Amino acid sequence: MNNKVNNIKITQIKSAIGCKYDQRLTLIGLGLNKINKSVILENTNSIKGMVKKVKHLLEIKNM
């Protein structure tokens, strides 16, 4: 059985100024609030959905 957890590194590359309020809340939920801030999160369905919502503001890398 493979217990390896897939992680993704998410970096905010654009500002949330001018974005909808729910997109700003999504960034905060991902742990991002400043440009060039990065977080490493588990690659779960809920995280994938949040990333998809604000993908135009992010850079995503598999780890």
Curated annotation (Swiss-Prot):
Keyword set, alphabetical order: Ribonucleoprotein, Ribosomal protein
Signal peptide: none
A biological-process GO annotation: translation
Family: Belongs to the universal ribosomal protein uL30 family.
Annotated HAMAP family: Ribosomal_uL30_B
Subunit structure: Part of the 50S ribosomal subunit.
Name the UniProt record assigns to this protein: Large ribosomal subunit protein uL30
Source species of the chain: Rickettsia typhi (strain ATCC VR-144 / Wilmington)
